[in-house]
Amino acid sequence: MKKIFAILTLSLLALGAYAQEAQKATSADYGYKQTGFMSTPKLGAYIIGSYKYSDLAGANGGPGFGCRLIRAYVDGSIFSDFKYRLQVQLSGTPHMRDAYIEWAKYKEFSVKMGQFKRAFTFENPTNPWEVGVGDFSMVVKKFAGFGDRLGEGNMGGRDQGIQFQGDLIPMGENDSYRLIHYQIGMWNGQGINQVDANKDKDIIATLQIQPIKGLYIGAFGWKGSWVKAATATAPATEFARRRVSAGAKFDRDNWTVRAEYAAAVFGEKQQILDAGRPNYVGSDAVYVTVGVPLYDWLKVYVKWDEFREGATAATSHDIYSCATNFRLHKNLMLQLEYRRHENQLLPTPGYNEIWLQTYIRW
């Protein structure tokens, strides 16, 4: 322990000395009268429309036409060191999605504070345009905050807190990539646009290795809690979060491979969501996604996605999907997807879906 402390102390001292020298070399005058060194704010928005058909019993053919997402955002930088982003979701009930500022002067160490994505799983921070299929995996949805297994609503994988991250050990010619990526942060635990509900904070961390450019292998850990609000008939209830995840991703030359596994551990217990069904102590999920480029404008994805509510075959929900992405322009995409479900918790486990989605942004 003493050796580790000594190494960390020396590393921080070295980083501080490096920062001072860099500041002497190129520094701007700070002050309330300073109005320069600020980028022009970048404004943008995107819309994802959809048509969904389902032959699930009782689904009446599926939801039909809909608007999956409408989002608008603004981002920019000040002094090139401080970055900011605001993102609002306009579909459904309008609300703030992202709102943060990040000090990002050095690749090795940066600090982000506000409302933003939780550092759990590779897929969670992925833009919906780049997921490949029409929805996030159940690893992300059940374990990162898109309708959490504990009962938390759809927070888009986000929370409010502070995060430290960086990339270490330059590799390749001209520092083309870094060997190690780390993130560690502290969040409220209640999701977006919510105040903290207890004195505890969620701690989430990840350590990732990039042995070759584009290939990341990583592990994630999460320790925290979520508080279900009190109702007229029940007091507030606190649920522990104890989660781990491991996986790999490869993105290079338009080829994509992602695979991840996540599990609830150390007694994380979900609330009873449906009458007559147990509140399972253990759950896990896994997915594998492969994206193959056929042309510059055409890419095909295949995916296996599984969530086991009770960590057993009898409680599994599997989705097998194939999606064709027609990327006609950087800002225009059409997506056609077939999805086969095998949900063992339904009276009739097997059913089919066809999704058509349109993506446009500016």
Enumerate the language-model features and the residues they cover.
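Outer-membrane beta-barrel "beta-signal"
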Residues: 326, 332-333, 350-362
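Outer-membrane beta-barrel proteins
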Residues: 54-56, 122-125, 136, 193-195, ...
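C-terminal hydrophobic structural anchor segments
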Residues: 291-335, 339-342
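Detector for outer-membrane/organellar transmembrane beta-barrel domains
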Residues: 208-310
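A generic beta-sheet turn/junction motif
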Residues: 92, 250-254, 362
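Outer membrane beta-barrel
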Residues: 30-192, 197-204, 208-217, 289-294, ...
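N-terminal periplasmic/intermembrane-space "pro-region" immediately following the signal or transit peptide
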Residues: 4-48
